[in-house]
């Protein structure tokens, strides 16, 4: 089991699908925003990042994965920009000390690093005017409006168009179906509330997923857990299900043989 950010279902910086045969989606459970902060400058296009020192996070991180895709599509290459592995609190400090010019983070609004960035003087939040075009090219992204004053009395100071992606709960295809149902049941309890970019009841969902849906996921989201798993503790529910699946067929065969054997014996006599 793992939580996976939108976009990891695509190869490298392209929008070509990965081999998705071994991973299944149980549900999307949250929305994370793509925050692009700049120091002492306002930008509305990714092309304006050329020549800047840009923090996008370490290798393998969700922030770096999204940043490289967006930079490639904006035709900003490695020779046009200085990329940094800094992220989180380290990126906040580097931006404050003029060691970076811009930072991209993929995180929920409640993130400590995001809150710190928003509170720094001279730090601007990018307002991407071509966000609709970006989402057309990247199915795992959505364009959302962050209205003025949403985060604080005057934060942001104006309406901002942002990119967002979903965080998904995924599992290996070989994981036992009962464990998949259990994980999804927990997600349904924990992730049903609302947030900045979504309303209560929007999650868990199966919209805009990167990997195929687990068969148990759709059934559980629509119908809930099987009756036995709702009534009994998980371990006992599995015992009862095994009894039903194994003992009941054997019992039926035994009863059939008990009726058949006497007739066969009489026929032999």
Residue ranges: model-predicted function:
Residues 145-212:
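Secondary-structure end/capping motifs
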Residues 26-30, 47, 56-64, 84-88, ...:
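Solvent-exposed, acidic/flexible segments
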Residues 18-23, 27-31, 191-269:
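N-terminal hydrophobic or amphipathic helices and topogenic motifs
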Residues 21, 62-69, 90, 94, ...:
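Extracytoplasmic/secreted proteins, especially bacterial periplasmic and envelope-associated proteins
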Residues 32-97:
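Bilobed "Venus flytrap"/periplasmic-binding protein-like clamshell domains
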Residues 1-51, 58:
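Short, glycine-/small- and polar/acidic-enriched structural segments
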Residues 78-164, 175:
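Pocket-lining segment of extracytoplasmic ligand-binding domains
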Residues 3-6, 10, 40, 50-53, ...:
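Sec/Tat-exported extracytoplasmic proteins
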């Amino acid at each position: 089991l793992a939580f996976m950010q939108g976009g990891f279902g695509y190869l490298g910086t392209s929008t070509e699908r990965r081999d998705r045969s071994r991973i299944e989606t149980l549900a999307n459970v949250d929305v994370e925003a793509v925050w692009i902060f700049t120091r002492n400058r306002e930008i509305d296009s990714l092309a304006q990042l050329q020549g800047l020192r840009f923090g996008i996070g370490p290798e393998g991180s969700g922030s770096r994965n999204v940043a490289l895709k967006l930079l490639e599509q904006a035709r900003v290459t490695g020779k046009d920009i200085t990329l940094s592995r800094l992220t989180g609190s380290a990126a906040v400090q580097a931006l404050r000390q003029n060691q970076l010019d811009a930072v991209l983070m993929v995180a929920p609004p409640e993130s400590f690093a995001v809150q710190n960035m928003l509170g720094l003087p001279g730090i601007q939040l990018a307002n991407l005017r071509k966000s609709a075009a970006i989402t057309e090219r990247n199915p795992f992204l959505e364009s959302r409006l962050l209205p003025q004053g949403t985060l604080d009395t005057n934060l942001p100071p104006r309406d901002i168009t942002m990119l967002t992606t979903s965080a998904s709960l995924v599992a290996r295809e070989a994981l036992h179906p009962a464990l998949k149902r259990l994980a999804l049941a927990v997600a349904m309890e924990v992730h049903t509330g609302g947030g900045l970019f979504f309303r209560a009841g929007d999650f868990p969902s199966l919209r805009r997923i990167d990997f195929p849906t687990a068969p148990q996921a759709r059934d559980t989201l629509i119908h809930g857990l099987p009756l036995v798993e709702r009534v009994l503790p998980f371990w006992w529910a599995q015992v009862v299900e095994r009894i039903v699946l194994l003992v009941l067929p054997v019992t039926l065969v035994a009863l059939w043989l008990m009726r058949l054997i006497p007739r066969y014996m009489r026929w032999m006599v």
